[in-house]
């Protein structure tokens, strides 16, 4: 029986330069999709998958994330005075329980692998999930919950994957495939942002992982890889070399790349159309522009 996945790491230290000037004074992860910030969707997904402890790897200028997941007593009192108990209940229901959240700093932006390494003291000796808020997942069963179910069968390390055009493989970590049953893929290696002509497949990793704690040893000794950064995929490759299984899961649902402006807009439209109050009005607005 595999150790359960109870902890999740949220790397939120990035500068969000692609969204300037909006992100000059606001963390990218706090940009709203309809009525919730990006990071909230990721935390809700983790809660739905059974995660009990939430670790945020932050940097300077990210205090709005801390505030978002804290109590706002003045706001709560105002809502009570105005009889908006339904809004208050919704806010409280979305908060993790006291003691479930912790924060650590990534003082220098050295890449995703380094950000994950910064959480080593919080994670300890347990498997853990990593969720990148840039990837907003729209799934009937939450993406991470699908991954946890798969992990209970496979053990080892696991990532959510998508298939992309070969020309786009240079943007992702790409799997070197051993076997593929149509949903679960076993990999013999992972290549970070390869030349498309040399990519071992077109199956690429997106921002959802379940990882074994042994990765911290490799991240501690890692040399900068692609882009001069400490790459998480390089350390995952070391675990594969040591005999740990690595699988990719074709999740059921849609992924929106909200680190890209068009992806952000698409997510806003898609979730807006699904919103029970806003959907009909948004359809009317969109039809006026098409």
Walk through the language-model features, giving the residues of each:
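Positively charged, low-complexity intrinsically disordered leader regions
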Residues: 2-8, 280-287
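N-terminal glycine-rich phosphate-binding loop and ensuing alpha1 helix
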Residues: 2-80, 106, 142-146
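Residues at the starts of beta-strands that form the adenosine-phosphate
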Residues: 7, 52-54, 100, 127, ...
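Structural beta-sheet core signal
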Residues: 10, 56, 130, 159-160, ...
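Conserved beta-strand scaffold positions in the cores of enzyme catalytic domains, especially
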Residues: 30, 101-103, 157, 246-248, ...
């Amino acid at each position: 029986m595999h150790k359960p996945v109870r902890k999740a790491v949220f790397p939120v230290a990035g500068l969000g330069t692609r969204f300037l000037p909006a992100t000059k004074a606001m963390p990218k992860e706090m940009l709203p999709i309809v009525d919730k910030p990006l990071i909230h969707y990721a935390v809700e997904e983790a809660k739905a998958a059974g995660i009990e402890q939430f670790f945020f790897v932050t940097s300077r200028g990210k205090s709005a994330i801390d505030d978002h997941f804290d109590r706002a007593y003045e706001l709560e009192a105002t809502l009570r005075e105005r009889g908006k108990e339904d809004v208050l209940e919704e806010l409280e229901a979305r908060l993790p329980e006291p003691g479930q959240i912790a924060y650590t700093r990534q003082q220098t932006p050295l890449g995703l692998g380094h950000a994950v390494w910064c959480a080593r003291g919080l994670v300890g000796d347990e498997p853990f999930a990593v969720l990148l808020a840039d990837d907003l997942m729209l799934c009937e069963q939450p993406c991470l919950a699908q991954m946890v179910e798969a992990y209970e069968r496979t053990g080892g390390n696991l990532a959510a994957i998508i298939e992309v055009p070969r020309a786009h493989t240079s943007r992702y970590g790409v799997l070197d495939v051993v076997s593929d049953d149509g949903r679960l893929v076993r990999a013999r290696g992972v290549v970070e942002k390869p030349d498309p002509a040399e990519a071992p497949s077109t199956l690429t990793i997106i921002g959802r992982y379940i990882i074994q704690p042994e990765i911290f040893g490799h991240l501690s000794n890692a040399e900068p890889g692609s882009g001069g950064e400490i790459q998480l995929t390089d350390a995952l490759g070391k675990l594969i070399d040591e005999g740990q299984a690595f699988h990719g899961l074709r999740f059921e649902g849609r992924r929106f790349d909200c680190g890209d402006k068009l992806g952000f807009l698409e997510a806003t439209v898609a979730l807006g159309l699904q919103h029970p109050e806003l959907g009909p009005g948004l359809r009317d607005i969109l039809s006026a522009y098409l």
